[in-house]
UniProtKB/Swiss-Prot annotation:
Belongs to the glucose-6-phosphate dehydrogenase family. The keyword Phosphoprotein applies. It is an enzyme of class 1 (oxidoreductase). GO terms for cellular component: cytosol; membrane. GO terms for biological process: glucose 6-phosphate metabolic process; glucose metabolic process; NADP metabolic process; pentose-phosphate shunt, oxidative branch. This is Glucose-6-phosphate 1-dehydrogenase. Its main location: cytoplasm. GO terms for molecular function: glucose-6-phosphate dehydrogenase activity; NADP binding. D-glucose 6-phosphate binds at K171, H201, Y202, L203, G204, K205, E239, E258, K360, R365, Q395. The modification N6-(2-hydroxyisobutyryl)lysine is found at K171. Pathway: Carbohydrate degradation; pentose phosphate pathway; D-ribulose 5-phosphate from D-glucose 6-phosphate (oxidative stage): step 1/3. The modification N-acetylalanine is found at A2. It comes from Bos indicus (Zebu). It is found in: Cytoplasm, Cytosol; Membrane.
Length: 515
């Protein structure tokens, strides 16, 4: 294997900048104004400000880019710097660059429903205008309840008259099909679809963005990517911690609403879609919508809902189950784990179960896609062989590996499980992977919507899950308990087994980068 030669930061950023200028309408001479609505919030300090800093540090932002924070809290730029800088991962040598970054930052404290405040914001934005035109990017780092008022005031008062205007909307995009449609219709009455960027940071993950290349560039995978060869698929999202500090967000509709309905379903689309006619954003999203239209509403009989309980053998947070969290209402039936089986009813995937699993307070942090292939006909090894699997690990330790059978070294003719492995940290030791938000925000500057959710995608996703969510809300059935730090409820394993997934538990992938 050829060794990867490390590029300097200047070389890497120079190459990327050249690609940006060739691929997109990316004008260095224009003034760009990045407005963060909700600048004092957790998302802004942990993700948005650090991301803008990394792009600024690497020279990937246009020269005249200004960051404007807007919130109803009485903060200053100094306050913003104090709370966000710990997430910058900066070094003492970068202090001059940091000073330059915050010199491009300003802050405004006012109410979100005060029209006069938006007029004042617009005056401040006009004062920053230094080029032939000004482009404005509004990031709504707000609770969804504030979207209507804020977008209306932005549209009426603050949009650029000489350049483009783009708006980033954070998930969740509604609570069900009706509320999502109402929100989409409201925003569509103010902005065109090519101005709206519905962001889900999982679509910016390196391995997720690699899915289309794996599928449509490698001839070895094309002929086997169908129901004739694949027995079932699982899409897994696991977190080792509970709801600590985030109860109010999760409690709305549970983990189906938070994780399964959007990030997992979006990854399913990339795995199941047909080959688009090009890498144009709308061509890709057209084929994602076609896949979603082939998925029927989730059947309650194909769903397991569960809620974590305390683990008396552990310490710390694990000793407190979800019902014991003082922020949780007594008798809450919110699910913290869910497993559901979907079917894509088309020629390629007819009969193949797509298993979606997500949960909190589990035994590990992991997000992955697992394709399990059909058994080999004519078994001559007396059922000693396990199914082949293609595993796409999104986090942690990004990897793509194929689990297959080989002869165990030694005197005897016995097969054992092994893998063909592309571990990103091992293969690309000298390559810096951009953060997911870094990729996506740069995409917004460039005008690329490939990795953002379109309104018709959103509508189809809610069509699939809304009946189930309404059933859960109506019935208020008590979820099945599982122990904090476990694999989840046994009933989820039984559901997977019932639809054809084979879990042997005899093999665990070892990250070679840590050996």
């Amino acid at each position: 294997m050829a060794e990867q030669v490390a590029l300097s930061q200047t070389q890497t950023c120079g190459i990327l900048w050249e690609e940006l200028c060739q691929s997109y309408s990316f004008h260095q001479s224009d003034t760009h104004i990045f407005i963060i609505m909700g600048a004092s919030g957790d998302l802004a300090k942990r993700n948005i400000y650090p991301t803008i800093w990394w792009l600024f540090q690497d020279g990937l932002l246009p020269k005249d880019t200004f960051i404007v924070g807007y919130t109803d809290s009485h903060f200053t730029v100094a306050n913003i710097r104090k709370q966000s800088e710990p997430f910058f991962k900066s070094t003492p040598e970068e202090e001059p660059k940091l000073e330059e970054f915050f010199a491009h930052s300003s802050y405004m404290a006012s109410q979100y429903d005060d029209v006069a405040s938006y007029e004042h914001l617009n005056s401040g934005m006009n004062a920053l205008h230094q080029g032939p035109q000004a482009n404005c990017l509004f990031y709504l780092a707000l609770l969804p309840s504030g979207y209507r008022t804020v977008t209306k005031n932005i549209c009426d008062t603050c949009t650029s008259q000489t350049g483009w205007n783009r708006i980033i909307v954070e998930k969740p995009f509604g609570r069900d099909l009706q509320s999502s449609n109402q929100l989409s219709n409201h925003i569509a009455s103010l902005f065109h679809e090519d101005q709206i960027y519905r962001i889900d940071h999982y679509l910016g993950k390196e391995v997720v963005q690699n899915l289309m290349v794996l599928r449509f560039v490698n001839r070895i995978l094309g002929p086997i990517w169908n129901r004739d060869n694949i027995a079932c698929m699982s899409f897994t999202f696991k977190e080792p911690f509970g709801t600590e500090g985030r109860w109010s967000y999760l409690s709305e509709s549970g983990i189906i609403w938070e994780v399964m309905q959007n990030p997992l379903l979006q990854i399913l689309c990339l795995v199941a879609m047909e080959k688009p006619i090009s890498t144009n954003s709308d061509n890709i999203r057209d084929d994602k919508v076609r896949v979603l239209k082939c998925i029927s509403k989730v059947q309650v009989s194909n769903v397991v809902l569960s809620q974590y309980m305390e683990n008396p053998t552990e310490e710390g947070e694990a000793t407190r189950g979800y019902p014991e969290d003082p922020r949780v209402p007594h008798g809450s039936t919110t699910d913290t784990f869910a497993a559901a089986v979907l079917y894509v009813e088309n020629e390629r995937w007819d009969g193949v179960p797509f298993i979606l699993r997500c949960g909190k307070a589990l035994n590990e942090r992991k997000a992955e896609v697992r394709l399990q292939f059909r058994d080999v006909a004519g078994d001559i090894f007396r059922q000693q062989c396990k199914r082949n699997e293609l595993v796409i690990r999104v986090q942690p330790n990004e990897a793509v590996y194929t689990k297959m059978m080989t002869k165990k070294p030694g005197m005897f003719f016995n097969p054992e499980e092994s893998e063909l492995d592309l571990t990103y940290g091992n293969r690309y030791k000298n390559v810096k992977f951009p953060d997911a938000y870094e990729r996506l925000i740069l995409d917004v500057f460039c005008g690329s919507q490939m990795h953002f959710v379109r309104s018709d995608e959103l509508r189809e996703a809610w069509r699939i899950f809304t009946p189930l969510l309404h059933h859960i809300e109506r019935e208020k059935a008590r979820p099945i308990p599982y122990v904090y730090g476990s694999r989840g409820p046994v009933e989820a394993d039984e559901l997977m087994k019932r639809v054809g997934f084979q879990y042997e538990g005899t093999y665990k992938w070892v990250n070679p980068h840590k050996l």
